[in-house]
Amino acid sequence: MNEALWDVDAMAAAMHARPLGDLPATISGISIDTRTLEAGDAFFAIQGDRFDGHDFLTAATKAGAALHVVSEQKLPALGRVQSPLLIVDDVLKAMSRLAEAARARSKATIVAVTGSVGKTTTKEALRHGLAADGKVHASAASFNNHWGVPLSLTRLPRDARFAIFEIGMNHPG
């Protein structure tokens, strides 16, 4: 397992989660995609327009997920899940709460990049330029929407000196 990213008790408290099962003390990452999940990650079963992360719990377990964050509403349909769970009212809202906790615990200088063109290029240029002055955390790929920004924040290491987030704007609010 990689370096600890989150203490599970702190995670559960931040997300207002109910623990179920034998939870690990820490997790090393946050994932919403079983194809990129690494052993020791917490898997967030986000429900989207075309998919439901709850359908991928078995794949997440096989990939090495340390725990699953699942919706209370989906719990009856899950049957007997062998992995530890953090049960929440809404998985995306819980991830947003964890993102708020990540921001609150960080002393990093935060840079938000937005606009209609060039966000990813600007974010990457800043990441490379700031790296000489300390540890930089930057959102992966173009994670700039209503789930990508909180996901990127939840992955913010405590010791990052800088954090760069790409923020898209596709509608008011």
Identify what each model region corresponds to.
Residues 1-97:
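N-terminal leader/targeting and accessory segments in enzymes
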